[in-house]
């Protein structure tokens, strides 16, 4: 594994040797030891948001999107209505989930470099009293933009509506306190800022809302009410759990706490982001977002203007030097993305910048 490239992506991402080694043990899915492992993971996850008094942690097999779909399908009644706030591809995915599930919804879309504002939400909720829930992406992974969650959450509370947060790319690195930010559900996953491996999502569901959600779900496997009720009764998952993923996440959480928890994880990622932005600027590559709305999770860069630049060739050359980047996901301009998260520090980020600079010279890309 020493020759494996560093994944500068928003997940899956580079994990530690300890996390990978945790997957070398096989677990019985009904065994008491594994049940205790699951309970410990959920307890530690709740502690990150100070949510044990107000929310249940409900784990679910699959990618983060599975958990997002489960949260909407379980917590939004079939006669509810979701206002989906969009400024990127993952907000659009939220709207598509509502459409496929048959949940009434409306959308409010801003430009990919424009956060939704609390004033926008205030106006939209005043104009449409039928809305029961608001769904938003905290950190929109398609650009790295950070939406103003605390301000928006207070507006939603004032209107008596309920908030569903996709915190896939922010949970564990950006502060979210359940005692200060009112939300019905917050969704995240194992393979992002916690530096576990992909394969498990989890939903922090407000206790009274989850208790009232029986019968809402469109799906047996994605019924969070049933999943929680079964776990509370037996300590077990309803269906075969991703045992190795859970074990890896448990180990990743131990390292998270050893590092210093959220403040330390946030600081490392912020240092990574600054090193990346400063280094790329020095070679002429422009970031898509202004610094004040850039989350230290993933950075979008404008592609060079030079005709000799082709992303596929650029990607393969950078990969050969030990770094895997991410293609752009914008509709209007050509970009590429570089993640700041995973088991990597500022020295690794500087090495990645050096590799990018060397590749651009090799490609004779001059018009940056």
UniProtKB/Swiss-Prot annotation:
<keyword id="KW-0808">Transferase</keyword>
<dbReference type="InterPro" id="IPR024169">
    <property type="entry name" value="SP_NH2Trfase/AEP_transaminase"/>
</dbReference>
<keyword id="KW-0670">Pyruvate</keyword>
<dbReference type="InterPro" id="IPR000192">
    <property type="entry name" value="Aminotrans_V_dom"/>
</dbReference>
<dbReference type="InterPro" id="IPR015424">
    <property type="entry name" value="PyrdxlP-dep_Trfase"/>
</dbReference>
<dbReference type="InterPro" id="IPR015421">
    <property type="entry name" value="PyrdxlP-dep_Trfase_major"/>
</dbReference>
<dbReference type="Pfam" id="PF00266">
    <property type="entry name" value="Aminotran_5"/>
</dbReference>
<protein>
    <recommendedName>
        <fullName>2-aminoethylphosphonate--pyruvate transaminase</fullName>
        <ecNumber>2.6.1.37</ecNumber>
    </recommendedName>
</protein>
<dbReference type="GO" id="GO:0047304">
    <property type="term" value="F:2-aminoethylphosphonate-pyruvate transaminase activity"/>
</dbReference>
<feature type="modified residue" description="N6-(pyridoxal phosphate)lysine">
    <location>
        <position position="192"/>
    </location>
</feature>
<dbReference type="GO" id="GO:0019700">
    <property type="term" value="P:organic phosphonate catabolic process"/>
</dbReference>
<keyword id="KW-0663">Pyridoxal phosphate</keyword>
<comment type="function">
    <text>Involved in phosphonate degradation.</text>
</comment>
<comment type="subunit">
    <text>Homodimer.</text>
</comment>
<keyword id="KW-0032">Aminotransferase</keyword>
<comment type="similarity">
    <text>Belongs to the class-V pyridoxal-phosphate-dependent aminotransferase family. PhnW subfamily.</text>
</comment>
<dbReference type="InterPro" id="IPR015422">
    <property type="entry name" value="PyrdxlP-dep_Trfase_small"/>
</dbReference>
<dbReference type="InterPro" id="IPR012703">
    <property type="entry name" value="NH2EtPonate_pyrv_transaminase"/>
</dbReference>
């Amino acid at each position: 594994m020493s020759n494996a490239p560093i994944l500068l992506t928003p997940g899956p991402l580079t994990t530690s040797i300890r996390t990978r080694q945790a997957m070398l043990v096989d677990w019985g899915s009904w065994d008491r030891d594994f049940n205790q492992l699951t309970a410990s993971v959920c307890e530690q996850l709740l502690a990150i948001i100070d949510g044990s008094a107000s929310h249940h942690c409900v784990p679910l097999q699959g990618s983060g999107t599975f958990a997002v779909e489960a949260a909407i399908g379980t917590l939004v009644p079939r006669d509810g209505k979701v206002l989906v706030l969009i400024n990127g591809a993952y907000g659009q995915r939220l709207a598509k989930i509502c459409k496929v599930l048959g949940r009434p919804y409306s959308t409010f879309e801003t430009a990919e470099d424009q956060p939704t504002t609390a004033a926008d939400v205030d106006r939209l909720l005043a104009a449409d009293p039928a809305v029961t829930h608001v769904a938003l992406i905290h950190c929109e992974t398609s650009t790295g933009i950070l939406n103003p969650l605390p301000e928006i959450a207070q507006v939603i509370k004032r209107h008596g509506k309920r908030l569903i947060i996709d915190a896939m790319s922010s949970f564990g690195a950006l502060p979210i306190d359940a005692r200060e930010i009112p939300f019905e559900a917050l969704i995240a996953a194992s393979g992002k800022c916690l530096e576990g491996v992909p394969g498990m999502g989890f939903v922090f569901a407000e206790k009274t809302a989850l208790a009232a959600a029986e019968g809402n779900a469109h799906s047996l496997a994605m019924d969070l009410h049933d999943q929680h009720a079964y776990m509370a009764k037996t300590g077990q998952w309803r269906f075969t759990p991703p045992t190795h993923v859970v074990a890896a996440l448990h180990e990743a959480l131990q390292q998270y706490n050893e590092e210093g928890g959220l403040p330390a994880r946030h600081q490392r990622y912020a240092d990574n982001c600054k090193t990346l932005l400063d280094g790329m600027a020095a070679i002429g590559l422009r970031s898509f977002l202004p610094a004040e709305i850039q989350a230290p999770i993933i950075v979008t860069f404008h592609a060079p203007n030079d005709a000799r630049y082709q992303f596929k060739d650029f990607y393969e050359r950078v990969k050969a030097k030990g770094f895997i980047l991410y293609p752009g996901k914008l509709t209007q301009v050509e970009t590429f993305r570089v993640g700041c998260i995973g088991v990597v520090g500022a020295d690794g980020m500087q090495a990645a910048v050096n590799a990018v600079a060397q590749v651009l010279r090799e490609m004779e890309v001059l018009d940056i």
